[in-house]
Amino acid sequence: MLIITIKQGKEHSLLKGDPWIYLSAVEKVEGRPQERNKPGATAIVQSSARRFLARAAYNAKSQIAARVWTLREDEPVDHALIKRRVQAALARRLDAWRSADPQALVQLVDAEQDGLPGLLVHGYGGADGEGGQGGYLVCQFNAAAVEFWKVPIVQALLRETGCPNVYERSDKLVRDAEGLFVKARALAGEEPPQRLMVREGERLKPMDIRTGFTYPR
């Protein structure tokens, strides 16, 4: 297990709820080289007095050195935690997706707000699969924290939504800053069509939901 020691006085923002630990706040990182070089590996975060502060995902390639998973010492970061976080996020928003216009792009997971650092998920096509395609989930894995747990995240999304189509969209600038490869691909089922009509308020706009590009009309 990696151990991140925070510089004296730099723990205050963490204790106030800041989910990011910047490289400038890190005094040292202890652990095997293969773990230190694995983006997203779980680390124990401690104060300079060696007091437990958090469990976080460590990324040596980013200026955001660690992203907090939990402040509870008795809460392990494992498949069960990932499943619970995805379930809780979807429980807050699935009803909204089910009642939304099938052509609306509805946010289902909101990164740190849902305890899933860097993960954004939007649903299109209705939770019940308008158009016979089963709808689409478009995911952005914008941090090593969730990149590390991609497989169980996708499994949980498939199970909880019943949506068969999951597509990974990449933000190049964000993933470059995390030292992650840029990927755009279907993770399950079918890739969304290049051009779909997406409702924004009262208007329908032609959009490529794989990239967020809005076509000129």
Regions found by a protein language model. Name each.
Residues 1-125, 132, 193:
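Non-catalytic accessory regions of SAM-dependent methyltransferases
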Residues 42-43, 136-137, 164-167:
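Structural motif
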Residues 57-62, 144, 210-215:
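A short, sequence-level motif marking secondary-structure junctions
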Residues 78-85, 145-153:
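Short amphipathic alpha-helical segments
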Residues 109-116, 120-127, 147-217:
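Non-catalytic substrate-recognition/targeting regions of SAM-dependent transferases
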Residues 125, 134-147:
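A short interface-forming secondary-structure element
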Residues 129, 136-138, 206:
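General beta-strand recognition
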